[in-house]
From Swiss-Prot:
This is Constitutive coactivator of peroxisome proliferator-activated receptor gamma. It comes from Homo sapiens (Human). Belongs to the constitutive coactivator of PPAR-gamma family. Residues 333-416, 443-483, 863-910 are annotated as: Disordered. Interacts with ESR1 and RXRA. Interacts with PPARG; in a ligand-independent manner. The gene is FAM120B. One of its GO terms (cellular component) is nucleus. Functions as a transactivator of PPARG and ESR1. Functions in adipogenesis through PPARG activation. PANTHER family: CONSTITUTIVE COACTIVATOR OF PEROXISOME PROLIFERATOR-ACTIVATED RECEPTOR GAMMA. The lineage of its organism: Eukaryota, Metazoa, Chordata, Craniata, Vertebrata. Gene3D superfamilies: 5'-nuclease (3.40.50.1010). The modification Omega-N-methylarginine is found at R885. It comes from the Eukaryota. It is found in: Nucleus.
Length: 910
């Protein structure tokens, strides 16, 4: 994670940038400096999972009671010190970082293979050096923290950007995590979670200002350094030859430096002594070997610019950024500019604006001086104060607006000047809504074309003016142009929405009504909380008016910014999308918003033995459930399309090279009374709707016929029974002994304290039990998905693992059951548990019999169970799917047009 080699460099070459600090003292200082303001730490939760998971056992599926207790202690310690914690989780994987995500998943696969090899050889858990976090840890940590009353947020993009942005905008005490990217962002202080001593609240602060002093750079140069070294966006090998050229020049005058540390020092030296000379005179691609990677490089640099920040290394057009607090922020990232650092002139005095010089950079940076308040606004400040955007103040609104210059023609781009200036501003003003619209100048015909920017100026869209109505209609970029174009804006969720052309698979734009009675500004300052125009039905009707024009000149690929990715919206209902987005941001759902917005989801590694052909991967087992959920969530989309939609699944399973996502189609389901709409499931508060929610949930598991039996089961075992029925119907190699172990551990868990679970030690580690434990936990995460998609018919606490599963306890029961121990022994001679055990077992077995699945012990297995999963002739999707394992093979291998075609072999593991 983070910048390649920077963590090691800091530890070996620049240890002085690490300072031991105490959170209690920092909090006290913060309170005295900002009275009435609670000291707040933004926590990058994904970086902290390894630190938080303190239980000794991790191989058996997770010690969830112990883990929950550790989280509670963590929260209590900071609360006692008067420190508020805000937890951020990754809500999605950005496309720019997909390759890095895949690389890590494949690396994890190799680690898992070594883990299972060790287990089979030693029959014990490997040492902590082979530690692998239990499956579902990130998902359930969100719910654990919410249960503990903590503010928990799920990101709409990569979490590190939102963490850094939140910390800067809310004047936080600092960021707690373990990612060197936080040394690159110009934000609040960065503290290490790995160095945290919870008892004393001591940790290490990594100071980016001291890092800059050591490297001879200023904070604004760090994104350039990070991209030249390699990060999650820029592959490490992209500039390898360039780095070694820098190293050759550097080592010729320096001696006795280690190679790795030398590279970072050498690249920094090249930036400060060579690149500085050309700054403002040449573009980066003229002084760096960017080649075909120019767009990616600029995108990597722009990804570090927080709302309101600019880079002195390239000039940017303002782009709208949506943060979790629904604030629309202006950032910019025009890489095609001349990189001239603009000078602002006082409109009255015509004086040139003074320059400010950073302490280490030895270069001048312009500032703009407002004629009235005489307040200097630096473009690039020294490392201590925060970096600001040069702004002009409009004569009426007194609102600060970032300035920009047109890079190609020598024509001034729309600027606003001081109140005394009598300078004409090249702005297009709609006389009715008083909406300022910047003009777009085509460099070839030299003809001015009005541009539509909307309230979130992410991307300029050429406007077509009708000859009669004089109404501006947004132009549609055809499928050949391969250009992503901004479409409608969700009025309340502040999210930009895209829809997909079903044949071209291109993103089709829809714009807000251009004659809306609302003001659309060209750009906004970071502190302006600008409201978006309210969307109307007319926006959708504009689709029919949009004309295809493949001739439209594409915007330069270097015009990128750290905004939320423009998404292919699978669902067009903005009200439902708003609800889904809210649940997503508040960490109340799992995958639902990803499915509805982008139609793309992922699932990380699971402890699965790739050599065990008898147990299928959890990705396959739970796929039919996900397909039915897709049918529910995307029903609105399917009504208006002639071709069936497909969701892109990046699920890790043995043998999957992850070169492409699996294209998975929705699977229709039969629900008593018909499939209810999402508005009914999510928004209708009538008591009778709860029955329909439960019917829908059971239909997702294809268990509508077992509704009465499941309703008779008491909490919290209802959800567990539903999951066990599904598992045993789907996987024929699960036997009666497995069922006994699953039920026994759930019952015994209810009477165990955390200390009892800590002291529990299985006789040895069985690789099959390891995989079964992970399989059940992945089933619980699937329950989170289904429950949230259906409007929460069940209490979330009923299927939280700390209430129904413990890894070591399950392992113990599995080993006992495998050896043929009596049920009374499994239940620890507790008679009350015995009655519940037989009731739960009866419910599962009866439901399975309805699906023609008889659960037997291992002694009754025939030869067809050896090394294969599934019974010949049984339907994988069971009732109502039309697929059969014996006749059709695995149905997900043929997903129709546009999907990858797979070999027609029902047992082939990719």
């Amino acid at each position: 994670m983070g910048v390649r080699g920077l963590q090691g460099f800091v530890g070996s070459t620049c240890p002085h940038i690490c300072t031991v600090v105490n959170f209690k003292e920092l909090a006290e200082h913060h309170r005295s400096k900002y009275p009435g303001c609670t000291p707040t730490i933004v926590v990058d939760a994904m970086c902290c999972l390894r630190y938080w998971y303190t239980p000794e056992s991790w191989i058996c599926g997770g010690q969830w009671r112990e883990y929950f207790s550790a989280l509670r202690d963590f929260v209590k310690t900071f609360t006692a010190a008067g420190i508020k914690l805000i937890f951020f989780f990754d809500g999605m994987v950005e496309q720019d970082k997909r390759d890095e995500w895949v690389k890590r998943r494949l690396k994890n696969n190799r680690e898992i293979s070594r883990i299972f090899h060790y287990i089979k050889s030693h029959k014990e858990q490997p040492g902590r050096n082979m530690f692998f976090i239990p499956s579902g840890l990130a998902v359930f940590t969100r719910f654990a923290l919410k249960t503990l009353g903590q503010e928990t947020l799920c990101s709409l993009q990569e979490a590190d950007y939102e963490v850094a942005s939140y910390g800067l905008q809310h004047n936080c005490l600092g960021i707690l995590g373990e990612d060197t990217d936080y040394l690159i962002y110009d934000t609040c202080p960065y503290f290490s979670i790995s160095e945290l001593c919870l008892e004393s609240l001591d940790t290490v602060m990594l100071c980016r200002e001291k890092l800059c002093e050591s490297l001879g750079l200023c904070v604004a140069d760090l994104p350039l350094l990070a991209c030249l070294l390699g990060n999650d966006i820029i592959p490490e090998g992209m500039f390898e030859s360039f780095r070694y050229k820098c190293l050759s020049s550097y080592t010729s005058v320096k001696e006795n430096f280690d190679k790795k540390g030398n590279i970072i020092l050498a690249v920094s030296d090249h930036i400060s002594k060579v690149l500085y000379l050309y700054q403002g005179e040449k573009k980066l691609e003229e002084i760096l070997p960017l080649g075909p990677n120019k767009a990616l490089f600029y995108k990597g640099m722009a990804s570090y610019l927080l709302p309101g920040q600019k880079s002195p290394w390239f000039f940017q057009k303002p782009k709208g950024v949506i943060t979790l607090d629904k604030q629309v922020i202006s950032t910019s990232s025009d890489a095609e500019s001349r990189e001239e650092v603009p000078m602002c002139s006082d409109a009255e005095s015509r004086q040139e604006v003074p320059m400010c010089t950073g302490p280490e950079s030895r270069r001048e940076v312009p500032v703009y001086t407002d004629s009235e308040p005489r307040q200097e606004v630096p473009m690039c400040s020294d490392p201590e104060p925060r970096q600001e955007v040069p702004t002009c103040t409009g004569p009426e609104s007194r609102r600060e607006v970032p300035m920009c210059s047109d890079p190609e023609p020598r024509q001034e781009v729309p600027m606003c000047t001081g109140p005394e200036a009598r300078q004409e501003v090249p702005m297009y003003t709609d006389s009715e809504p008083r909406q300022e619209v910047p003009m777009y100048t085509d460099s070839e015909p030299r003809q001015e074309v009005p541009m539509y920017t909307g309230s979130e100026p992410r991307q300029e869209v050429p406007m077509y003016t009708g000859p009669e109505s004089r109404q501006e209609v947004p132009m549609y970029t055809g499928p050949e142009s391969r250009q992503e174009v901004l479409i409608r804006t969700d009025p309340e969720s502040r999210q930009e929405i895209m829809c997909t052309g079903h044949e071209s698979k291109q993103e089709v734009p829809i714009c807000t009504d251009p004659i809306s009675k609302q003001e659309d500004s060209m750009c906004t300052h970071a502190e302006i909380n600008q409201k978006l125009p309210v969307a109307t039905d007319f926006e959708f009707k504009l689709e029919a008016l949009m004309c295809t024009n493949p001739e439209i000149k594409q915007e330069d690929p270097t015009n990128v910014g750290p905004e939320v990715k423009q998404q292919v919206t699978m669902v067009s209902d903005t009200e439902i999308l708003k609800v889904a987005r809210t649940h997503h941001v508040q960490a109340e759902s799992y995958l639902v918003y990803n499915i509805m917005s982008s139609g793309e989801i992922e699932c990380s590694n699971t402890l699965e033995d790739e050599l065990d052909q008898a147990l299928p991967s959890q990705a396959f087992i739970y796929r039919p459930i996900r397909q039915r959920v897709y049918s529910l969530l995307l029903e609105d989309c399917q009504d208006v399309t002639s071709t069936c939609l497909a969701v892109k699944e990046w699920f890790v399973y043995p043998g999957n090279p992850l070169r492409h996502p699996d294209l998975v189609r929705p699977l229709q389901m039969t629900i008593p009374g018909g499939t209810p709409s999402l508005k009914i499931l999510w928004l209708n508060q009538e008591p009778e709707i709860q029955v329909r929610r439960l019917d829908t949930l059971l239909a997702c598991f294809n268990l509508s016929s077992s509704r009465e039996e499941l309703q008779a089961v008491e909490s919290p075992f209802q959800a567990l029974c539903c999951l066990l029925i599904y598992l045993f119907v789907q996987v024929d190699t699960l036997c009666l002994e497995d069922l006994h172990a699953f039920i026994a551990q759930a019952l015994c868990l209810q009477g165990k304290s955390t200390s009892q679970l800590v002291n529990l030690q299985p006789d040895y580690i069985n690789p099959r039990a390891v995989q079964l434990g992970s399989l059940l936990v992945r089933g619980l995460t699937t329950l989170v998905l289904v429950n949230s998609a259906c409007g929460f018919p069940w209490k979330t606490s009923d299927f939280m693992p700390w209430n129904v599963f413990d890894g070591k306890l399950f392992h113990q029961k599995y080993l006992q059951s495998e050896k043929g121990y009596a049920v009374e022994v499994l239940l620890e001679q507790n008679r009350s548990r015995l009655t519940k055990f037989h009731n739960l077992k009866a419910v599962v077995c009866k439901a399975c019999m309805k699906e023609n699945r008889r659960i037997t012990g291992r002694a009754h297995w025939g030869s067809h169970h050896a090394g294969r999963w599934g019974r010949q002739g049984s339907s994988y999707h069971r009732t109502g799917s039309g697929y059969s394992r014996s006749s059709q093979g695995q149905p997900w291998r043929d997903q129709g047009p546009g999907s990858r075609q797979y070999e027609h072999d029902q047992w082939r593991r990719y």
